[in-house]
């Protein structure tokens, strides 16, 4: 199998590609023909990272930050689980699907060490013996003149519960990929075999259910949230003619936005309905121009803070004009004295812009993603202080008006 290793936002050297490979990769990365060649191209990934296979071609796209940092951020964003780098024990240049598979297998082994989690599930069946409660109405409707079978409802204590279904679905999704590590494939097979009696459920990426945790199932939290991450992100599959492509991809834009939102909400001690990506008024009075800021803080029906989280490849180390214009539109429509743009550190320098004739102050802040999850969350604490300050200013201005 041919292999191509790419890095987020970096342009590669030339590679020969077939038309099918070129067209399929063009859905994921920028493909540019090399002058004076018939079939050679340079490849430039955007914010999408991961790995995919196109026929006999294997392509790996590494993130700018390490994969342990990426997985720590993504797991915190999806379930507020604080994985440390030591929890992701794999070689530095491991492909993302292999890294996820190794992490899932390790988390499953820890969780299953106390035995498979069981729970009660309500079942309704027609049986020849009474179990649980007889559903009289159903019995009369379906079998008015028959004594057997009996329509019953009962609670079954089983391992075929949502938590195990999520883990099994995630393990089989990764196992369907061509993982590079034989040991990782073996560990995933062990996870699937352990869950052999659990139903295989298809979970849509946009509708992966949450599991409620308590003292009885807290030991499952890591493996469940890691499974939800796998199921929610990146299953990629397509076919062009005889060439089939599949892989696992994650959008760093989504990971960063979700992490900043969840981490700030936790630091500020606010519920989902009060802080995050919420519905805001339109820019114009006729409601023709919709606004969708990533971050807003609401006190009842009044917005007291607005901001955006941006994960971009910025070349001149300053916030792009378009981002500043967008933030100005948010602040204007919501009648706020200013707003905040949050970038990954290294993409834009912290700055403050006072807008002429508008009385608006636009602030730019950064979050360093390169350290441990505890270090990143510490920088979120400083960011939360800026959010509180902007909110306090907005409330002062409104009281003075």
Regions found by a protein language model. Give the residues of each.
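Residue(s) in the substrate-gating loop at a strand-loop-helix junction
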Residues: 1-240, 244-246
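Catalytic core segments in nucleotide and nucleic-acid processing enzymes
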Residues: 1-22, 236, 243-401
């Amino acid at each position: 199998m041919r292999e191509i290793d790419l890095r987020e936002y970096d342009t590669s050297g030339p590679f020969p590609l077939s038309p099918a490979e070129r067209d399929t990769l063009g859905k994921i990365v920028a493909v540019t023909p090399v002058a004076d060649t018939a079939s050679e191209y340079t490849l430039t990934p955007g914010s999408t990272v991961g790995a995919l296979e196109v026929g006999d071609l294997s392509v790996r796209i590494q993130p700018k930050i390490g994969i342990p940092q990426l997985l720590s951020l993504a797991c915190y964003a999806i379930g507020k689980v604080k994985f440390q780098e030591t929890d992701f024990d794999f070689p530095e240049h491991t492909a993302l699907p292999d890294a996820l598979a190794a992490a899932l297998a390790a988390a499953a082994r820890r969780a299953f060490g106390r035995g498979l989690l069981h729970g009660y599930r309500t079942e309704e069946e027609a049986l020849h013996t009474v179990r649980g409660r007889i559903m009289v109405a159903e019995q009369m409707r379906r079998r008015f003149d028959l004594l057997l079978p009996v329509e019953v409802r009962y609670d079954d204590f089983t391992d075929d519960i949502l938590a195990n279904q999520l883990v099994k679905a995630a393990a089989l999704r990764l196992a369907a990929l061509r993982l590079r590590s034989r040991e990782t494939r073996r560990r995933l097979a062990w996870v699937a075999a352990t869950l052999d009696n659990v139903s295989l459920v298809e979970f849509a990426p946009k509708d992966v259910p949450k599991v409620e945790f308590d003292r009885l199932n807290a030991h499952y939290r890591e493996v469940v949230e890691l499974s939800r991450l796998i199921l929610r992100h990146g299953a990629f599959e397509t076919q062009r003619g005889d060439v089939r492509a599949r892989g696992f991809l994650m959008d760093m834009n989504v990971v960063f936005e979700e992490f900043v939102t969840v981490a700030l909400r936790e630091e500020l001690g606010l519920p989902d309905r009060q802080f995050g990506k919420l519905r805001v008024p339109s820019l114009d009075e006729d409601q023709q121009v919709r606004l969708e800021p990533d971050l807003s803080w609401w006190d009842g029906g009044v917005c007291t803070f607005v901001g955006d989280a941006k994960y971009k490849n910025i070349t001149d180390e300053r916030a792009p004009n378009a981002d500043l214009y967008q933030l100005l539109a948010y602040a204007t429509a919501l009648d706020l004295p200013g707003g905040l743009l949050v970038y990954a550190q290294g993409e834009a320098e912290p700055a403050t812009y006072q807008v002429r004739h508008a009385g608006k102050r636009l602030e730019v802040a950064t979050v360093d993603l390169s350290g441990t999850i505890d270090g990143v969350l510490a920088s979120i604490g400083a960011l939360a202080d800026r959010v509180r300050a902007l909110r306090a200013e907005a409330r002062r201005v409104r009281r003075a008006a």
